[in-house]
Amino acid sequence: MFKATARYIRVQPRKARLAAGLMRNLSVQEAEEQLGFSQLKAGRCLKKVLNSAVANAELHENIKRENLSVTEVRVDAGPVYKRSKSKSRGGRSPILKRTSHLTVIVGEKER
């Protein structure tokens, strides 16, 4: 099992979970293809994290890329940046800029 994380990514967790669903329980090649065709911003971020996890596997255990599959994908909510927008009659409305923590774990395919 090899893990890679990206923290404090400026992507809403709800939207990132949609992209994470595309790559669950797939081989690394299939997951990369799925994320490559995805037009979501989170897809680009998850592809980078996936490549990092694969690089960890290749570097530390000398496992070939073809023998790896996505074991777990986790998207957790990070801190929320709070901004405000002025409204009529002296009021304001909050604008919440959400962040995500992305975790991808890859492991060897079960034979």
From Swiss-Prot:
Source organism, top-level taxon: Bacteria
GO molecular function, one term: rRNA binding
Pfam families in alphabetical order: Ribosomal_L22
UniProt xrefs under InterPro entries: Ribosomal_uL22, Ribosomal_uL22_bac/chlpt-type, Ribosomal_uL22_bac/org-type, Ribosomal_uL22_sf
GO CC annotation: cytosolic large ribosomal subunit
One Gene Ontology biological process: translation
NCBIfam families: rplV_bact
Subunit note: Part of the 50S ribosomal subunit.
Role played: This protein binds specifically to 23S rRNA; its binding is stimulated by other ribosomal proteins, e.g. L4, L17, and L20. It is important during the early stages of 50S assembly. It makes multiple contacts with different domains of the 23S rRNA in the assembled 50S subunit and ribosome. The globular domain of the protein is located near the polypeptide exit tunnel on the outside of the subunit, while an extended beta-hairpin is found that lines the wall of the exit tunnel in the center of the 70S ribosome.
Protein name, entry field: Large ribosomal subunit protein uL22
Species whose genome carries this gene: Chlamydia pneumoniae
Gene name in the database record: rplV
